[in-house]
Swiss-Prot record:
Compositionally biased region (Gly residues): 20-29
Name under which the protein is recorded: MAP kinase-activated protein kinase 3
Protein encoded by which gene: MAPKAPK3
Motif (Bipartite nuclear localization signal 1): 350-353
SMART domains referenced in this protein's UniProt entry, alphabetically: S_TKc
């Protein structure tokens, strides 16, 4: 493409359809060579930004021959960029993983870059979809089915010795707006092979970061299991188990609560949630990574492998996400900015029971509820 990217061209650009998908799920070996000719020969690029990945922005594009809408991610060539492409290519074609359709190696402003063409996930983010349901109830059974799908993606990665290391809501996208849309995991910017004990780099998203990432301990696939616990927690109530009380992306207090496993299951949001679900969260959020469930154990847990018989209890999730929409967006922005600024804190991890947790969003909700209650009872409650 020699200097031209989606940032500079008008018109849409989707990736070409690759039968079966490359990588571990498609061609044996999982690695393919990037195409060296201009991406614009095959795709029409658009200025429409679809999202921001760890290492680069994602733009809309269209396959010239088929008209298929795709997503293009531009990475300036570096060992880190090559690693991201390698890991995503290896995983592409796996269940519930965004598929790579093509990769190009082009020059842009005199610099070599890699352009990843992926299937376009037009259904948006996981929690946005739940948030948009309005009065339609989101049930515990639906949460279990979603967790089973995410677990299926992680199981595929872990079975091929890849740790994703950045499993978070923004990286879980739906293929379309339709009811039968498929949820898929994307953005392999922090993914690493786990065969060489290499997972020691402090790059992560604070609200979904495992305790050992915040200290000197090595961490591996169990990081992804911790993230599954946090996502499952949010699915079942609408807010995260850990919060920064200072407004910073991650505060010393929040680090401490993550390290000590300080979270709770407060009412009314958790009053009707099954004990099976709470037990599974406890097993995922263990502060000692050696005690945390493996992905195989997670997939074999009754709440996951018998998700069709999980109670269809209506949850508070959709309402909470909608009511706290502004705060949720702010939290996501904080997480993004924190990726570049967080540093490892070498305090020792200690496990401690918690009687009460100080969750900023939850306290705000409780205060609001107390105000409504006191107004109806005619008493003034601070």
């Amino acid at each position: 493409m020699d200097g031209e990217t989606a940032e500079e061209q008008g018109g849409p650009v989707p990736p070409p359809v690759a039968p079966g998908g490359p990588g571990l799920g498609g061609a044996p070996g999982g690695r393919r060579e990037p195409k060296k000719y201009a991406v614009t020969d095959d795709y029409q690029l658009s200025k429409q930004v679809l999202g921001l990945g760890v290492n680069g922005k994602v733009l809309e594009c269209f396959h010239r021959r088929t008209g298929q809408k795709c997503a293009l991610k531009l990475l300036y060539d570096s060992p880190k960029a090559r690693q991201e492409v390698d890991h995503h290519w290896q995983a592409s074609g796996g269940p519930h993983i965004v598929c790579i359709l093509d990769v190009y190696e082009n020059m842009h402003h005199g610099k070599r870059c890699l352009l990843i063409i992926m299937e376009c996930m037009e259904g948006g983010e996981l929690f946005s979809r739940i948030q948009e349901r309005g009065d339609q109830a989101f049930t515990e059974r639906e949460a279990a089915e979603i967790m089973r799908d995410i677990g299926t993606a992680i199981q595929f990665l872990h079975s091929h010795n890849i740790a994703h290391r950045d499993v978070k809501p923004e990286n879980l996208l739906y293929t379309s707006k339709e009811k039968d849309a498929v949820l898929k995991l994307t953005d392999f910017g922090f993914a690493k092979e786990t065969t060489q004990n290499a997972l020691q780099t402090p790059c992560y998203t604070p609200y979904y970061v495992a305790p050992e990432v915040l200290g000197p301990e090595k961490y591996d696939k169990s990081c992804d299991m911790w993230s599954l616990g946090v996502i499952m927690y949010i699915l079942l109530c609408g807010f995260p188990p850990f919060y920064s009380n200072t407004g910073q992306a991650i505060s010393p207090g929040m680090k401490r609560r993550i390290r000590l496993g300080q979270y709770g299951f407060p009412n009314p949001e958790w009053s009707e949630v099954s004990e099976d679900a709470k037990q599974l969260i406890r097993l995922l959020l263990k502060t000692d990574p050696t005690e945390r469930l493996t992905i195989t154990q997670f997939m074999n847990h009754p709440w996951i492998n018998q998700s069709m018989v999980v109670p269809q209890t209506p949850l508070h999730t959709a309402r909470v996400l909608q009511e706290d929409k502004d705060h949720w967006d702010e939290v996501k922005e904080e997480m993004t900015s924190a990726l570049a600024t967080m540093r490892v804190d070498y305090d020792q991890v200690k496990i401690k029971d918690l009687k009460t947790s100080n969750n900023r969003l939850l306290n705000k909700r409780r205060k609001k509820q107390a105000g409504s209650s006191s107004a109806s009872q005619g008493c003034n409650n601070q």
